[in-house]
Amino acid sequence: MEKTRKFKFAMSRDGIIAYDRETPMTIRFTPEESNEMTKKIYDYTSMDYYCEVAHLEISNTCNMNCSYCYTGDKKGHELTTIEWRMIIDNLAKGGIFQVSFGGGEPTLRKDMFLLAQHVAHTGMNLGMTTNGMTLPAMTPDEKRSLKTYFKQINVSWHEDAKIVERALKVLKDFEIPAGINYAFSRTMQKDNEVVKELAKEYNAEVLYLVYKPIDLDFKEQVPADVVRDYAQKAANDRIKVAVDGPCVGQCLMKKKFIDVDSLGFVYPCSFVRKPLGNLLHSSFEAIWKSRGEQDECPFVKFEKEKVV
């Protein structure tokens, strides 16, 4: 018997959003489609945008030292398990659909699975971005826990195919949906075929990301339309692909996404480090309501929104 889907619904400036936690899948209805579905006329332009995703920097330590990391120096200052549980509850109460663990390196936290269990208890969906180094050394029970709690785990590409391959093998062996986060910089553009081959072999999705020059190394940035073309070619090669907002002319800052750092401060974007408030001191609803208008991105020049 086919399982009945249970959608969460939200009304936003763009229309009605339907989210299926199990898939996970998001269906977006235009204002016209939303009015037809509800048999009522709503003025969606008077509504606010709905925040769907929160990225949680649960760790401020890392076993790599990437110069392009958006969180900057890793000083090891982190919240306690209880404090992160409070933040997770705060986000769930605010209606967030999905959270993603990141860092730093999230797997370095000894309480990662306790936090993952708490996310599941709140009913939110959970993903993770990791550099993959620790996955092969996890115990069988820990690997099974990865499958239990995480809907998808993405391994970041840092020019070391062996690290990524070992991590992807763990995810494939335990039937955990996998992805490769591929920051498409000038330096890493050469790795495209290697990334695609790994994705094919391990049935992983490639997330093509426009490089954000946080160190003002704009020469490393490949234009968004070029990144999008590479993603399209990968899709034509029957590789599962996804792209970030800049690839399609969308900036999610203050519209659908927030980043929460290792001390509970909320940022409008992982790369724009201007705190909007702290989830240990304010409700998510209050922070979102007072966030103000979308700022101009200091790292990416957005083209007109595209459909791909």
What are these regions (language model features)?
Residues 76-84, 220:
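Flexible, glycine- and charge-enriched loops at secondary-structure boundaries
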Residues 1-75, 256-257, 268-270, 283-306:
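N-terminal pre-core extensions flanking Radical SAM catalytic domains
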Residues 74, 214-219:
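A short acidic, helix-capping loop that chelates divalent metal ions and anchors anionic groups
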Residues 220-248, 270-308:
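C-terminal accessory region of radical SAM enzymes
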Residues 260-261:
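Short, acidic, Ser/Thr-enriched surface-loop or helix-capping motifs
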Residues 81-102, 109-209:
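Radical SAM/AdoMet-radical enzyme domain recognition
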Residues 48, 247-252:
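Short loop/turn motifs at secondary-structure junctions and domain boundaries
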